[in-house]
């Protein structure tokens, strides 16, 4: 069996765990959480020819982007989210991922907030 990661989440006060091996698996897991919690979302939203964000969610403040990362370089992600936040349609961004540096990215770019959540994983 290959190596994977497990994350836990809560649906209607019930804790659940999911496994993921790559970013597409994590996208599917996040999508399942949105569905289970009846959160309206769009997946792989094209913001421009170059920019496709993993998810958008409509909140009271407007459209919020969700970008997932399980590997990659911090500076590459900063360039990517800077592009995403330059779009008028995106009011804020959630970055969710496993790299150690996720919680060290800025909390604001382009005068828009960035919310960060590092997934602490168990490898099996």
Predicted regions and their residues:
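Non-catalytic C-terminal interaction segments of nucleic acid-processing enzymes
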Residues: 1, 58-60, 115-124
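Nucleic-acid nuclease catalytic cores
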Residues: 70-78, 85-118
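Well-ordered alpha-helical segments embedded in enzymatic catalytic cores
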Residues: 29, 79-80
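Acidic-basic catalytic patches of nuclease active cores, encompassing PD-(D/E)XK
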Residues: 1-48
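Conserved catalytic cores of phosphodiester-cleaving nucleases, focusing on short active-site segments
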Residues: 55-72, 84
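Short beta-strand or tight-loop elements
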Residues: 49-53
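Generic alpha-helical hydrophobic packing signal
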Residues: 19, 23, 44, 57-59, ...
């Amino acid at each position: 069996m290959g190596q994977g990661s497990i994350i836990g989440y809560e649906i209607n006060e019930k804790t659940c765990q999911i496994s993921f091996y790559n970013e597409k698996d994590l996208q599917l897991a996040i999508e399942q959480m949105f569905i289970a919690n009846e959160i309206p979302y769009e997946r792989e939203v094209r913001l421009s020819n170059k920019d496709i964000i993993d998810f958008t969610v409509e909140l009271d403040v407007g459209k919020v982007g969700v970008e997932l990362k399980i590997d990659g370089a911090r500076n590459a992600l900063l360039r990517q989210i800077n592009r995403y936040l330059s779009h008028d349609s995106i009011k804020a961004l959630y970055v969710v991922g496993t790299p150690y540096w996720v919680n060290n990215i800025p909390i604001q770019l382009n005068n828009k907030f960035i919310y960060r959540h590092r997934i602490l994983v168990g490898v099996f």
